[in-house]
């Protein structure tokens, strides 16, 4: 799977590192670092290759974290915030997949 190496979010240029190996935490699939404007996405989880759909949902998830931080809202903090981000990520992915005409106009 190919992901863009750069994404602009809220006027900020983010680097996307893919594939990234999380040596510090094996249970992590993605990470957003607002201090370095970096999004890291793993292509493996517990030594198993991840599906492209899962990788895309993770990218959306980390983009939502970046939007939340760059807008200064910080609405999605803590475990409850993660649940909301996860639900939004899956929902946005489903809408984009189920409605390809939306992707054409973007």
What are these regions (language model features)?
Residues 57-69:
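Active-site recognition of the HExxH zinc-binding catalytic motif
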Residues 1-53, 70-106:
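Metalloprotease/metallohydrolase-associated module, dominated by Zn2+-dependent proteases
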């Amino acid at each position: 799977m190919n992901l863009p190496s750069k994404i602009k979010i809220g006027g900020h240029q983010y680097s996307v590192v893919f594939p990234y190996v999380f040596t510090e935490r094996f249970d992590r699939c993605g990470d957003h670092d607002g201090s370095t404007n970096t999004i890291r996405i793993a292509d493996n989880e517990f030594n198993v290759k991840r599906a492209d759909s899962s990788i895309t949902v993770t990218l959306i998830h980390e983009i939502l974290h970046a939007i939340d931080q760059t807008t200064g809202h910080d609405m999605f903090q803590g475990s409850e915030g993660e649940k909301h981000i996860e639900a939004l990520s899956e929902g946005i992915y489903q809408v984009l997949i189920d409605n390809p005409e939306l992707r054409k106009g973007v």
